[in-house]
Regions:
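Positions that flank functional sites
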Residues: 177-178, 245, 394-395
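Conserved P-loop NTP-binding catalytic core
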Residues: 42-137
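Acidic, Mg2+-coordinating catalytic modules of nucleic-acid enzymes
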Residues: 1-19, 24, 49-51, 67-73, ...
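Short, basic, glycine/proline-bearing loop/turn elements
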Residues: 140-145, 208-213, 243-245, 310-311, ...
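Switch/communication elements of ASCE P-loop NTPase nucleotide-binding domains
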Residues: 1-52, 193-328, 345, 515, ...
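Extended helical coiled-coil dimerization/tether regions that scaffold
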Residues: 120-223, 228-237
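Short amphipathic alpha-helical segments and helix-helix/interface helices
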Residues: 159, 256-260, 279, 283, ...
């Protein structure tokens, strides 16, 4: 039995509001020590009107009637008269006076809150695997292991999910005497011909040889501890602090998928995490339920960026975004968007050398100029400080940068005239051969070949005819030095406007022009450069170091980008 007691809305310290559905999964993310766990504690404390920090300052929630609450209490607890009348249940003790106070105000008495809402800290889930006192099978369970003994469907869910992660089933040893330890292994199968005493001895003999859950490592105990509480039916909502703790990435991803599975439908979950694997797992199984809150801190001030359901669905359903590493940006203070993996490798190495005293940003390849805006939109909504690093020929197609300007607080109109100036200059000298003239030129080269064999020189001549270089190609190959006079001044003004929006065009044109001594191009270029010039302080990298130093050059520029 579970009461319908949803949290309807959260109000954060900065006044932002997040409305919730009855089965929402709210995931708090952000850098270390930003306030993720504090947000969980604030929500949990407000439910019972207890002191709280105030990162979440208001919680609007629906409180079930007294009769509904009392029906649940009678079903899942044991009433005891001594020393005073009270109810004992799974993780709670409720006294008569707390029942009397239930209807006197909008908040929950603390003990009743603990019955209906579970706050699963690291210590709580590690200790959940400890042996429990054996109880009467006819009474309610007062702990998760006792519940495993009483509820076969609950045991099946816990055991199957644990087996998916660790290839071992879970079995409570209720033949051990005064305590019920949790064993790792399959439930013994007995013969119909055995007597009751033989069955007891047989099962005890097998279970006593199994590994004990409470003696395992923290990863096993943490994973199992979460499962033990997650599948308890009566909780209206759960709060789980960093469920990925002690888990390897594949297990963290599986835990995320379990958290978002259909077994948790109809219940709200509030999670704090710094694991992209766990978040990806939740998104893969329950994207429609997820709300993301990115918490950051500067000094004593916290900031909150809210990602609503539509944004989350775009993040999880758009193939480009889903299979990128964009989710990882949630856990970094800054992100650098590059065109390719090779760009990311090169710029990260230069950053780590030139700006070693600063936290390294996430370097994220987007797969081409036209895709920068897709990533920038999400990063902006999440309040993530970012830099876009395109080749200079991003100017060729305004559609590739118009939205970047808009997100950054500027506009196409602010650069339109200068762009036309640059465009006209670059395209003024383009002369292309007609098809007839091109065929004539190639025929002449082929006719001159001796012995019917085409030499490398002749191939080069043909390629030269076909590969007519435009002014845009020259801009990409030489950067701003391809321009002179007023077009160069216009380019400089565009460059300044772009930088104010967090867009830093490669000053030498494209990545490969930073080290002209290496003629490779494409994915292998960066690896070849590092092999030829392993000392990143070498003068050959001076232009690249200067360029990387220009990103976020001051607090003013950083503030501009952070407001995108």
């Amino acid at each position: 039995m579970r009461l319908d007691a949803p949290i309807k809305e959260l109000v954060f310290a900065d006044g932002q509001r997040m409305p919730l559905e009855h089965d929402s999964i709210v995931v708090f993310v952000g850098p270390n020590n930003a306030g993720k766990t504090t947000c969980l504690r604030d929500i949990y404390s407000i439910l019972s009107n207890e002191p709280h920090v105030g990162l979440v300052k208001e919680v609007d929630f629906f409180k079930p009637s007294y009769d509904e609450m009392k029906t649940l209490l009678d079903k899942i607890s044991v009433k005891t008269q001594k020393p005073t009348p009270h109810y004992d249940g799974l993780g709670f003790t409720i006294h008569e006076f707390e029942l009397e106070n239930y209807s006197k105000g909008p908040y929950y008495p603390k003990a009743i809150k603990e019955m209906m809402f579970s706050f699963l800290s690291t210590d709580a889930r590690l200790s959940a695997c400890n042996p429990e006192k054996n109880i009467s099978r006819s009474g309610p369970a007062t702990g998760p292991i006792a519940l495993l003994v009483k509820d076969s469907s609950y045991l099946e869910k816990v055991s199957e999910s644990f087996s998916d992660a660790f290839s071992q089933e879970v079995t409570p040893n209720y033949f051990a005497g005064g305590e019920i330890p949790l064993c790792l292994g399959p439930t013994p199968v007995v013969s119909d011909e055995m007597s009751a005493s033989e069955v007891s001895d047989y099962i005890y003999g097998i279970l006593s040889k199994y590994p004990l859950a409470h003696l395992q490592g923290d990863g096993v105990r943490s994973f199992l501890g979460i499962l033990l509480y997650l599948y308890i039916e009566h909780y209206s909502a759960m709060f789980i602090d960093e469920p990925e703790s002690f888990l390897h990435p594949p297990q963290a991803n599986l835990m995320g998928r379990i958290i978002g599975s259909s077994d948790t439908s109809g219940r709200q979950l509030f999670i704090s995490t710094h694991s992209k694997e766990l978040l990806n797992g939740v998104l893969s199984s329950a994207a429609g339920r997820v709300r993301v809150v990115r918490v950051t801190r500067q000094g004593d001030d916290n900031a909150f960026a809210l990602l609503d359901g539509d944004d989350v669905r775009e993040l999880s359903s758009t193939t480009l975004l889903k299979y990128s590493d964009l989710v990882n940006a949630l856990f970094h203070e800054r992100t650098v968007l590059c065109e390719s993996d090779s760009d990311c490798m090169f710029y990260q190495a230069i950053w780590d050398t030139e700006r070693s005293g600063e936290a390294s940003p996430l370097f994220l390849p987007v797969g081409g100029k036209s895709r920068f805006k897709n990533f920038a939109i999400i990063l902006s909504k999440l309040g993530i400080d970012y830099a876009v690093v395109p080749d200079a020929d991003i100017l060729r197609n305004p559609g590739d940068f118009k939205e970047l300007l808009s997100i950054g607080g500027s506009s196409w109109e602010s650069v339109k005239d200068d762009w036309k100036n640059v465009k006209n200059d670059l395209e003024r000298g383009e002369n292309r051969l007609s098809a007839v003239a091109l065929k004539t030129e190639i025929d002449e080269i082929l006719d001159s070949c001796k012995g019917g064999q085409i030499s490398e020189k002749d191939c080069g001549r043909i390629r030269g005819l076909i590969d007519v270089k435009s002014g845009w190609d020259e801009l990409k190959r030489h950067g701003k030095t391809a321009l002179k006079g007023e077009p160069l001044s216009a380019y400089g003004r565009i460059e300044k406007t772009f930088a104010g929006c967090g867009v830093y065009m490669v000053p030498v044109g494209e990545l490969e022009c930073f080290v002209l001594e290496v003629t490779h191009h494409g994915p292998s270029w960066a690896a070849e450069v590092f092999q030829c010039y392993p000392d990143l302080n070498d003068d050959v990298y001076s232009k690249a170091r200067k360029f990387v130093s220009s990103w976020w050059p001051s607090d003013e520029a950083s503030d501009c980008c952070s407001q995108k």
